[in-house]
């Protein structure tokens, strides 16, 4: 993957955590130290989950070489579509999945794990295209750390509206990234231009 694609993927994967952090920041009104701690928890978990998915994907990669780009496209489209759907749902439905209002460690960890499940699915897809998972996982983790920290601080002042917009943009970016992988691996663009 190109550095630009890695940056887009990292930002896209961090938007769930950002949205949860804005929600949590709006309800908990954290200080800078609390926001940094939460960012660290989210970043570490978000970096680990694509590694888990990638490991599982490697096991299956040889079995599905002929359709790997379709699998990557499908997984990214499903994850992106889910993010778009959640971002456009009504506020009443969105509240059901919002970050827990309690500020204990376990609620924070549960929220971080919940927002990182999508990264595991993306990790599976990355195994099929032979991407450098270590660079990507580090980039996703760092980006999530920054976005979560900033999101919690923004949540103190702006509230939940900004978080839903970020989730929508992230979902659209993932669908676009999936389409780009499909186009590159099927040669459609080369055929059209050649």
Curated annotation (Swiss-Prot):
Family in the record: Belongs to the MntP (TC 9.B.29) family.
Residue spans crossing the bilayer: 2-22, 40-60, 67-87, 107-129, 133-155, 168-188
Protein name as it appears in the record: Putative manganese efflux pump MntP
Record's GO cellular component terms: plasma membrane
Function as written in the Swiss-Prot or TrEMBL entry: Probably functions as a manganese efflux pump.
Subcellular location: Cell inner membrane
Chief site of localization: membrane
Keyword Membrane set for record: yes
Topology class, membrane: Multi-pass membrane protein
Cited InterPro entries: Mntp/YtaF, Put_MntP
Keywords: Cell inner membrane, Cell membrane, Ion transport, Manganese, Membrane, Transmembrane, Transmembrane helix, Transport
GO molecular function: manganese ion transmembrane transporter activity
Superkingdom field: Bacteria
């Amino acid at each position: 993957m190109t550095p630009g694609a890695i940056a887009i993927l990292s930002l896209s994967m961090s938007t769930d955590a950002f949205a949860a952090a804005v929600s949590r920041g709006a309800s908990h009104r954290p200080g800078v130290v609390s926001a940094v701690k939460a960012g660290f928890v989210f970043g570490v978990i978000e970096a680990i989950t694509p590694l888990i998915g990638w490991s599982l994907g490697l096991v299956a990669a040889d079995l599905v070489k002929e359709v790997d780009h379709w699998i990557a496209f499908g997984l990214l489209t499903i994850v992106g579509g889910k993010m778009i759907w959640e971002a456009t749902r009504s506020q009443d439905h969105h509240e059901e999945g919002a970050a827990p209002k309690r500020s204990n460690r376990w609620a924070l960890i549960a929220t971080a794990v919940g927002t990182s499940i999508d990264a595991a699915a993306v990790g599976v897809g990355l195994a099929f295209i032979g991407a450098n998972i270590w660079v990507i996982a580090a980039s996703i983790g760092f980006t999530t750390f920054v976005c979560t920290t900033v999101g919690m601080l923004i949540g103190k002042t702006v509230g939940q509206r900004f978080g839903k917009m970020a989730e929508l943009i992230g979902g659209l970016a993932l669908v676009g990234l999936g389409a780009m992988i499909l186009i590159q691996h099927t040669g459609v663009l080369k055929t059209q231009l050649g």
